[in-house]
């Protein structure tokens, strides 16, 4: 068994800075060549502390950014202009990607479409709400105004 210090997050194994024991072949053929880990040494403990401190700083910064973006998203409604019939029924449906593009077009920052949750299928003109998961601890509810366009 090889004792390693992870330098990147590895699914099913651990996060950056964790000290793990893996089989020799996994270490030699996968983790070490891809620079996902370093061999453990006594001096490596100092490296572990610096990696953990950097990870904590990144987490804190991403949390602050997510909170700022959540406040901006909740400050004003986002307008989506979509094709609709005379009765207000849409040609198609509003998807997560449409919401993400509308948020970016409104100047409220860029969000990943996978973080948008639509509680109902939007198939007609009107006002709706969407949930956006910006961080594991931060979620925002945004108002969507779906209007008919050309």
UniProtKB/Swiss-Prot annotation:
InterPro entries hit by this protein: Ribosomal_bL9, Ribosomal_bL9/RNase_H1_N, Ribosomal_bL9_bac/chp, Ribosomal_bL9_C, Ribosomal_bL9_C_sf, Ribosomal_bL9_N, Ribosomal_bL9_N_sf
SUPFAM superfamilies in alphabetical order: L9 N-domain-like, Ribosomal protein L9 C-domain
GO biological process terms on file: translation
Gene Ontology CC: ribonucleoprotein complex; ribosome
Keywords of this entry: Ribonucleoprotein, Ribosomal protein, RNA-binding, rRNA-binding
Keyword Transmembrane found: no
UniProt cross-references to PROSITE patterns, sorted A to Z: RIBOSOMAL_L9
Superkingdom of the organism of origin: Bacteria
GO MF annotations in UniProt: rRNA binding; structural constituent of ribosome
Family to which the UniProt record says this protein belongs: Belongs to the bacterial ribosomal protein bL9 family.
Function: Binds to the 23S rRNA.
NCBIfam families found in the cross-reference section: L9
PANTHER family assigned to the protein according to its UniProt record, in alphabetical order: 50S RIBOSOMAL PROTEIN L9
Protein name: Large ribosomal subunit protein bL9
Lineage: Bacteria, Bacillati, Actinomycetota, Actinomycetes, Micrococcales
């Amino acid at each position: 068994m090889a004792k390693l210090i992870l330098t990147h997050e590895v699914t099913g194994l651990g996060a950056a800075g964790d000290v793990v024991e893996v089989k020799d072949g996994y270490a030699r053929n996968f983790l070490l060549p891809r620079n996902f880990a370093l061999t453990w040494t006594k001096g490596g403990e100092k490296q572990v502390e610096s990696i953990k401190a950097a990870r904590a700083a990144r987490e804190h910064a991403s949390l602050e950014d997510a909170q700022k973006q959540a406040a901006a998203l909740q400050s004003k409604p986002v307008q989506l202009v979509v094709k609709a019939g005379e009765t207000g029924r849409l040609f198609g449906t509003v998807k997560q990607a449409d919401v993400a593009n509308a948020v970016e077009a409104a100047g409220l920052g860029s969000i990943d479409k996978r973080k948008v949750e639509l509680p109902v299928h939007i198939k007609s003109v009107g006002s709706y709400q969407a949930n956006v998961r910006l961080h594991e601890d931060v979620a925002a509810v945004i108002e969507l105004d779906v209007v008919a366009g050309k």
